[in-house]
Amino acid sequence: MKYLIRLENTRTSRHEALLAFAPIPAGTVIGWGADEHSPDGIAYWTVTSCEEVAE
């Protein structure tokens, strides 16, 4: 199974999406990518939705 994960950047409110092989619950915060304005240099994203996609 594959899952479409929709993300919102916690600092910029930018939206992205990715495919994952396991579900990630909505509300989960993940560190993904770089953010030069973040103290630790990591961009943080909140999962806004997780949908199973047909293969």
Please annotate each region the language model reported:
Residues 11-13, 29, 47-49:
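N-terminal compositionally biased, intrinsically disordered segments and leader/signal-like regions
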Residues 3-9:
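A short beta-strand micro-motif
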Residues 11-16, 38-42:
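Short, surface-exposed beta-strand/loop "edge" segments at domain boundaries and coil↔beta transitions
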Residues 15-35:
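Short, flexible N-terminal segments of the mature chain
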Residues 32-55:
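Short, mixed-charge low-complexity intrinsically disordered segments
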